[in-house]
Amino acid sequence: MAMHFIFSDTAVLLFDFWSVHSPAGMALSVLVLLLLAVLYEGIKVGKAKLLNQVLVNLPTSISQQTIAETDGDSAGSDSFPVGRTHHRWYLCHFGQSLIHVIQVVIGYFIMLAVMSYNTWIFLGVVLGSAVGYYLAYPLLSTA
């Protein structure tokens, strides 16, 4: 295995069954990794947007609700009960954790593909990352 970047139409990417031996196979592999890089950027933006949405929708302070309930002042309050708020928070946290795991796995797949030191693969990942950033980041500013 070469330890420097090379232009080649042959490579073994990630698994033995993903063995490329032709220019068409390399083009298809570059396209797959380009789309994975776009997906990675989309997941990154989606995770940030989801976290922002969760933080906006949760009560300002769960500890203030806990104090109010122990004082008996929350009977007339229209806020969420503490148990329900905690349950929502844990569900959102679990969802965020799953999204994070998916993002990490895709990121490591992309990194390992680049470590094949094939210049075409590297350029496909860089282009996919740029396209993903271009397409996904304007979504952060929309409500």
UniProtKB/Swiss-Prot annotation:
Residues 44-93, 141-143 are cytoplasmic. The modification Phosphoserine is found at S77. The chain crosses the membrane at residues 23-43, 94-114, 120-140. InterPro entries: Cop_transporter. It is a multi-pass membrane protein. Coiled coil: none annotated. Its main location: membrane. Residues 1-22, 115-119 are extracellular. It is found in: Membrane; Cytoplasmic vesicle membrane; Late endosome membrane; Lysosome membrane. Disulfide bonds: none annotated. The keyword Transport applies. GO terms for biological process: copper ion import; copper ion transport; intracellular copper ion homeostasis; regulation of copper ion transmembrane transport. The keyword Membrane applies. Ubiquitous with high expression in placenta and heart. GO terms for cellular component: late endosome membrane; lysosomal membrane; plasma membrane; recycling endosome. Belongs to the copper transporter (Ctr) (TC 1.A.56) family. SLC31A subfamily. Oligomer. Interacts with SLC31A1; this interaction stabilizes SLC31A2 and protects it from ubiquitination and the subsequent degradation. PANTHER family: PROTEIN SLC31A2, SOLUTE CARRIER FAMILY 31 COPPER TRANSPORTERS. The N-terminal domain may be involved in Cu(2+) acquisition from potential degradation products of proteins in the lysosome. This is Protein SLC31A2. The gene is SLC31A2.
